[in-house]
Amino acid sequence: MDNVINDEAIFKYCESNPKDRDCLCIHPEPTIEKIGEDLLLPYYCWYEPCKRKTAKIPTALRDNMKRCNLIDCSVSLGEINLLDGILKVNNDCLSSHAIYAGYSVKPLEQEIHLPIIDPKYLILGLAILALIVLINW
């Protein structure tokens, strides 16, 4: 019974204060929900306001959050450069261990063949040809 009363208080407070940082887990921005759909991962599993200790989270949402199969980590990138198609990331983190991974971008070598006849004229020509065949038949 306490959970119901507590949940009602949470919803009441967050309806009155939807922009409060502690209520953003209940009222996320549409872009956050869209990112969750694109990731195929509910926003409450990774969205920072849902991880806050002071977040106002109702019982049902808290139960759903327990099912999140996700390891949460924060990555902070320092300097990022793109030079001659090579992405260089300098990450000065707390650890002294770094793994170098070189990436390069190579444009596709492909030939583009333009159609001899514009497709709209091709369709028109086929329609006229079908009409001529129909008349002569």
Curated annotation (Swiss-Prot):
Tell me the membrane topology, using the record's own terms. Answer: Single-pass membrane protein
Which InterPro entries does this chain map to? Answer: Pox_virus_G9/A16
Biological process terms from the Gene Ontology for this record are: fusion of virus membrane with host plasma membrane; symbiont entry into host cell
- Transmembrane residues, as ranges? 115-135
Kindly list the places in or outside the cell where this protein is found, as annotated in its UniProt entry: Virion membrane
Recorded coiled-coil stretches: none
Identify the main location: virion
Does the record bear Nucleus in its keywords? no
Superkingdom: Viruses
Topological domains (Virion surface): residue ranges? 1-114
- Print the keywords alphabetically: Fusion of virus membrane with host cell membrane, Fusion of virus membrane with host membrane, Membrane, Signal-anchor, Transmembrane, Transmembrane helix, Viral envelope protein, Viral penetration into host cytoplasm, Virion, Virus entry into host cell
Gene Ontology terms, cellular component aspect? Answer: membrane; viral envelope; virion membrane
Per UniProt, subunit arrangement is:
Part of a stable entry-fusion complex (EFC) which is at least composed of proteins A16, A21, A28, G3, G9, H2, J5, and L5. Formation of the viral membrane is necessary for the assembly of the complex.
* Assigned protein family: Belongs to the poxviridae A16/G9/J5 family.
What this chain does, per the record?
Envelope protein part of the entry-fusion complex responsible for the virus membrane fusion with host cell membrane during virus entry. Also plays a role in cell-cell fusion (syncytium formation).
Name of the featured protein:
Protein J5 homolog
Q: Which organism is it from?
A: Fowlpox virus (strain NVSL) (FPV)
Upper classification of the organism: Viruses, Varidnaviria, Bamfordvirae, Nucleocytoviricota, Pokkesviricetes
